[in-house]
Amino acid sequence: MMLSRPKPGESEVDLLRFQSQFLEAGAAPAVQLVKGSRRRGDAHPDQLPPQDHRDVVMLDSLPDLPPALLPAPSKRARPSPGRPLPHDEDPEERLNRHDEHITAVLSKIVERDTSSVTVTLPVPSGVAFPPVFHRSQERQVKPAASSKRSIFAQEIAARRVSDNRAPSAEQVVPSPDAPEGAVPCETPSSKDRGSQLPGRSHSFHRPNLITGKGLRSQAAVQEVQTIHEENVARLQAMDPEEILKEQQQLLAQLDPSLVAFLRAHNHTREQTETKATKEQNPERPSVPVSKEEPIMSTCTGESGTRDKLEDKLEDKLQPRTPALKLPMTPNKEWLHMDTVELEKLHWTQDLPPLRRQQTQERMQARFSLQGELLEPDVDLPTHLGLHHHGEEAERAGYSLQELFHLTRSQVSQQRALALHVLSHIVGRAQAGEFGDRLVGSVLRLLLDAGFLFLLRFSLDDRIDSVIAAAVRALRALLVAPGDEELLDSTFSWYHGASVFPMMPSHDDKEDEDEDEELTKEKVNRKTPEEGSRPPPDLARHDVIKGLLATNLLPRFRYVLEVTCPGPSVVLDILAVLIRLARHSLESAMRVLECPRLMETIVREFLPTSWSPIGVGPAPSLYKVPCAAAMKLLRVLASAGRNIAARLLSSFDVRSRLCRFIAEAPRDLALPFEEAEILTTEAFRLWAVAASYGQGGDLYRELYPVLMRALQTLPPELSTHPLQPLSMQRMASLLTLLTQLTLAASTQPEATSGSVESCVVAIPSSITWTHVSGLKPLVEPCLKQTLKFLRRPDVWNALGPVPSACLLFLGAYYQTWSQQSGLCPEDWLQDMERFLDEFLLPLLSQPPLGRMWDSLRDCSPLCNPLSCASTPEALPSLVSLGCAGGCPPLSVAGSASPFPFLTALLSLINTLGQIHKGLCRQLAVVLTAPGLQNYFLQCVAPAPAPQLTPFSAWALRHEYHLQYLVLSLAQKAATSQPEPAASTALHHVMALVLLSRLLPGSEFLAHELLLSCVFRLGFLPENASGGPEAADFSDGLSLGNSGDPHCRRGALLVQACQDLPSIRSCYLAHCSPARASLLTSQALYRGELPRVSSLLLPVPKEPLLPTDWPFQPLIHLYHRASDTPSGLPAADTVGITMRVLQWVLVLESWRPEALWAVPPAARLARLMCVYLVDSELFRETPIQRLVAALLARLCQPQVLPNLKLDCPLPGLTSFPDLYASFLDHFEAVSFGDHLFGALVLLPLQRRFSVTLRLALFGEHVGVLRALGLPLAQLPVPLECYTEPAEDSLALLQLYFRALVTGALHARWCPVLYTVAVAHVNSFVFCQDPKSSDEVKAARRSMLQKVWLLADKDLRQHLLHYKLPNSSLPEGFELYPQLPRLRQQYLQTLPTEVLQNGGFKT
């Protein structure tokens, strides 16, 4: 139905009819009214109002399973109907709407609506031109009443009007005598004249402080004036001296800061008035002060006393500063120069002259914009921008405090500049440039000040330049220069891919041991204590953990995915991620599992197709292959086999490997250097995956590519000069082939059915037929490299290529020998051929001998200072400290022989293990003079290098070489009928190495215990008269023992016969934990399916303690302490006897192995033999062994080193152990002489008096059973009697024990002699320096001795002369007292002498 529109002439009746027809028709209106939104203005006309839908729950649509226990998503505000959701909005429009930059303001220019502006026509005037507009005239015009101005603006305007108002004619009285150009002064009015004090120059026109602004009444001004007049009246009634006194009293009561503020306020006001007066007469020049003085005197009358008092007081309170002179005279007409604020213009002055430091006081360090440390007296020009700071403005450079303050600036450029300077400072500190020029550590100071979290907060900035600066500073802090280069260059070494985690090794109660097979649930599940610790506490112990707790990884993901920064920022972020992945397995898992982080990196920086990149820096790294991204994947894969499997499967890394390896570096359409590094990292990533037995299918696909790459190696090696990047690529390719060859070996059988040892072995996709043709291609490479052995410069340029060739051949022969279906004669003949063609000519070359000679120069053990930590090393931030690279003569230097010799020894051991007939020919290596000299220096008594991150890394590679030499020596010993001359040296080296091996080398320690340490062939003394020599030595020093079975020679012979039992005992108590042993065994044997990670355990300490020969005895002691009922006698006697036998062998023939154990620690371990059981010491074998070991401790050359006062390893307190020993002796000894000898040994005079006080004070009952004869005392008697005792408390205990009869010569001859000697020396001492208390005690004790009823004891105490153990009494006596002693006795009181009745 069409309704016609109203036509002209129709009335309202027609309109009402049309409306009723429309309503009856029910048609939709042509226009719809919509209520506009208050927040967004008018709504869209085409948008329908939202309909009210109800939520209806349908049972059929409900799921069958209960919902997962996942946290509900965070609630968000529901948008209004007229406001689209953020995800429906164009991102560009959203960014434009939220953009607050100044450019956004300038780009949105809206023309102002002038339709409502009133247009005022010009006023008709008879002047041809309008008057010139002056700004001063505008100020004098009163504002319209209708205009609204703020109170503050009105006050400022009124103040300006009052200041600019010129004085009236009657107020200005020019001086008749004033010269031309003099400044007229103001004459006070009649009202002000009444407020002027007589005889004073100051008039009080109005109150200075009380203004009445806070009063709301209309009479506020009158009230203020009344108060002012009262104050003036009181001041007029006071003398100047009283005013000054009251002023001083008031100033003493007020706050100095308030006084300073009031003075500054008054000074500013007076200065403003003076300048306003001068500005009213701009045509007159200013007059010097000297010419103004008489004029002012004429104007004001007489000089004011109060001015002099004021000036005197001002000089006392604050020094006067020179007035600031402006370079021009300010004009009143200038904009904003009506009031000159001089305090704000001080910065325009020239800098004061630099003050030279005359003392040695410490000064605040200042740095340049490049992070250089500036000298305190350096004078630099100001245009360099190094003087824009407040404190010490004359000194150039910025302090750390000022840079921290600048990072909080509102100007983004200043924040970025401060972060850049801080990053330069951190980088130079990491590089060791500051050295000893600074007190303390810069990095420690920065971290304590919160630098880490300052960088984290800066990452959340909205400005790209600030983010870039923060990322660069974070990289400078976390990534030490040289660390990554060192680890990359040694990747192809012998087990070079296995590294220690770069996490702090210090103990922390919140740190938990990480399991090798760390699952995702365990990584995500934190302990309540660690989860509740704030990031600053975590960062104090571990910087990386503290950073990860601040959601650093999601922020990195946002920066990479959303902001798309430049190449430098991308490389910095990747470097930081690599450092985080090296921290631990937990950190690597967190990097891997950060949402969309790895996906973004793989998608953006490892694409499979890209546009060709020209020479020069790339504008962007996005959609371009990046070698750093590939390295990140490799480091993540090194953390665990699960991570490597996920990278290969979930992130499509297989296709990336195929893409980057299939083409040669020169064909990758990338810069040559970047292409070389990218291919190298691809080889390394594949090698890491192959270390777990993964990636075998890629080998079949890329087999032609690898063969072609191998064939090109010899020609590349013959070109000169050799490129370091190419050498690293070749070595990485050979390392990859080594791991692939090991993957083709037969899977070993599980050693047991336990869970930790039984790993489900997936059959390898690589078989022997796939790798059998690799050796003919690698041997030409080795032959080509060995040609350069006589040219050191070319040999050093080869890098790890020769080592990688040797390691590949060792893996090849090992895998070949494990093929059960092949004829052994084939590989045995090939080994003989290889020996004749390669090894024997190599071993006879002089350059190889020079390599053995250079071992000492490059050894960390022989040069402990080379492993010393840097001054900037932090325990919470692990770094290898390789700033500036390694020196050539170091373990990782370019001239280091360690990588090649270690690989050569590994190959020789493999050949000797497979072909026993080659051992004698290969043993020629052991006779190298340089190797023997190196071993002699390694076993020499010297302090071990401090265990730092770099020393742990370097020592691990050095221990590999030492172990391989010992393994070869063990193989050679089995094939030689007579022991070699260096056998004893090799045995000492094995003993020393066993106590030095670090975590991760559990398999090596176990092999040493099995093969070298307890091997009878490594003890040539047993067959060459060693026992007889021991008996002869003991006979010369101690006298011949009656029982031949008690002699040391017989005990040594018995110990050599019991070596298998001794080895079983130590294997049971000193072997590493089974789980760690199996992990290490899989790594060193090449059992790839059982390798769980290439991250080694944290090197907190060596695997075995330095006193490992006593470890079974210590375990037995702890078991006995925890078992009150006692241990089985058979186990106790057997373990104790084996330990004592082995310790006796080491004491006699291998004292170098016990140099690290001090004699006091050995004595404490012997005392544990008696504390284990109450009957153990009665066993005859135990007594003989303990007596022999005690005799070794009491030798004249060992006894001076027996120090019981210093801290002992493994012992908290020797006095506590000795107290327990006395209790045990008193309870179970029954006067055993050997037991008593151990009790007496710590009572020597040079040891602590605490031990003697414990015996004579708390364990006097021990004296009754301590019946060791003087002839059996293992040390000279003079060790107990000399020097004289100086402890008064102990002397009194001696005397009390003698007088009471607790100490007698019949049951305790040794201590009886000691007590008599010290008491006699004390009572007859006439030292004038003694205190009054000592003199009184001495006189009292002498009187008591004189009055003793026991004539024998009195005779001994008075006539004692010298100790003599050959006499029955143990000492000599004076037949008659010397004259001096007789005279001293005459000083006693007469009654004492008469009562004594003793004749001298």
Curated annotation (Swiss-Prot):
Q: Name one GO molecular function term.
A: DNA binding
The chain's coiled-coil residues are: none
Quote the biased-composition stretches of kind Basic and acidic residues, using this chain's numbering.
39-54, 85-95, 269-282, 519-539
Q: Tell me which residues bear Phosphothreonine.
A: 329
The alphabetized UniProt keywords are: DNA-binding, DNA-directed RNA polymerase, Nucleotidyltransferase, Nucleus, Phosphoprotein, Transcription, Transferase
Instruction: Identify one Pfam family in the record.
Output: RPAP1_N
What does UniProt give as GO cellular component? DNA-directed RNA polymerase complex; nucleus
The record ties this protein, via InterPro entries, to:
ARM-type_fold, RNA_pol_II_AP1_C, RNA_pol_II_AP1_N, RPAP1/Rba50
Q: Where is this region: Disordered?
A: 35-54, 60-95, 161-215, 269-310, 504-539
Q: What is its main location?
A: nucleus
Superkingdom of the source species: Eukaryota
Any single biological process term in GO: transcription by RNA polymerase II
Q: Where in the cell is it found?
A: Nucleus
Per the entry, what this protein does is:
Forms an interface between the RNA polymerase II enzyme and chaperone/scaffolding protein, suggesting that it is required to connect RNA polymerase II to regulators of protein complex formation. Required for interaction of the RNA polymerase II complex with acetylated histone H3.
Q: How does it assemble?
A: Part of an RNA polymerase II complex that contains POLR2A, POLR2B, POLR2C, POLR2D, POLR2E, POLR2F, POLR2G, POLR2H, POLR2I, POLR2J, POLR2K, POLR2L, RPAP1, FCP1 plus the general transcription factors TFIIB and TFIIF.
Return the protein name: RNA polymerase II-associated protein 1
Q: Which organism is it from?
A: Rattus norvegicus (Rat)
Q: What is the lineage of its organism?
A: Eukaryota, Metazoa, Chordata, Craniata, Vertebrata
